[in-house]
Amino acid sequence: MIQDGIKKIIQREDLSETEMSAVMSEIMSGEATDAQIGAFMGALATKGETFEELAGAARTMRRKAARIQVTSPVIVDTCGTGGDRKGTFNISTTAAFVVAGCGVTVAKHGNRSVSSQCGSADLLEALGMRLDAPAEVVEEAIGRIGIGFLFAPLFHGAMRHAARARKEVGVRSIFNMLGPLTNPAGANCQVLGVYAPQLTEMFAQALRLLGARRAFVVHGQDGLDEISVCAPTRVSELDGGLVRTYDLQPELLLGRKADPEDLAGGDPGVNAKITRDVLGGAIGPRRDVVVLNAAAALIAAGAAEGFPSAVRNAEESIDGGKAIEKLEALVRYTNEN
C-alpha cells in the first residue's frame, strides 16, 4: 500500500482518509522500510497534507496507541503542534491547570521539546512530576485529581517504526502534526495551537472527522501557536459539526495588549518558575495569555458560555488557589504511586 501511496502523491493526487489510514497502518506495524517511509514523508510534505489525510493518519495512530479510560463525558486537552519557534514559556500546559482548577477534566497530552528549549514534559519534570508513571497511575490521577499528563512516548510505541526515517530525513512531516489529534484518553474538547495560519481550518476539519465535540484551533498573527495577547489570533472553531474561522482581538477581550518579549521563556527551570508564579497569582501579560487560552478551553468544554464569563472563571481558578492546588496534587500523586 505504501508504494501505491507514494506513486499517487508524487502525481499530486490526494489520498482518501481510508488510503492514508492503510499506509500509516503499514508504517506503524513495522512493515514499511525506512526508504519507503522517508520517500512517503517527503512526497507528502511537498504535495501538502489535506485534512482527510491528517484524519486518516490520526485514526490509525489512535488505534495503535495504548489507551486509558476516563469516565468523564467531557475531556479537555490543550496540546498543540509546537514548532512556532517563538521561545515563549509553556502557555498551554500552564493553562491546563487553570482549566482543571475550574472542575473540568483535563488529559494533557505532550512530549519533550523538539524545537524549543522546553516542551510540556520538560516543564512538568522540572516542576517535580514523574513522567514515567504507569498508565494506570495517570488514569487514576485524572479520575481523582481531575488532571493527568499523558507522556507521548509511553502511549505511542508504534511510532518507533518511523523514528529512524524521521531522524535521517530531518524535516518537518505529518508525524509532527499528529500529537494533538491522538490523545490516548480520547479528549473530545480541545484548544489546539498550530505553527502556521493555513493549518487552522485543516486541523479543525480533521477534528470534525475524528468526532471532536468542540475545539478552537488557533494561530496568532505574531506567529504564536496559542491565542495571543500581542496580536489578533486566527481561530477555526469546531462546534456542532461545523467549522467557522474568524479573528480574536486580545484588546477586546482583555482591554489591553502585550509585547512579545513579555511572554519569553527559557530552559525548564526558568519556565517552571514562570508557571508557579502565574498559578500563584502573579499579574501581567503572562497571566493574561494563560487566562485567555484557559478561557477558550472552558468554552470548548461547555463550562462557560463565552469569553467574558470564561475569563472570569479562569481568573477565579488562579486567585482562589485552585489551579496551583491541581499542580501540587498531580506532582504529589505521580511520585507517591
UniProtKB/Swiss-Prot annotation:
UniProt-annotated binding residues for 5-phospho-alpha-D-ribose 1-diphosphate: 80, 83-84, 88, 90-93, 108-116, 120
Entry binding sites for Mg(2+) 2: D225, E226
Binding, anthranilate 1: G80, N111
UniProt feature coiled coil, ranges: none
Quaternary structure (record): Homodimer.
Role according to the record: Catalyzes the transfer of the phosphoribosyl group of 5-phosphorylribose-1-pyrophosphate (PRPP) to anthranilate to yield N-(5'-phosphoribosyl)-anthranilate (PRA).
Name recorded for this polypeptide: Anthranilate phosphoribosyltransferase
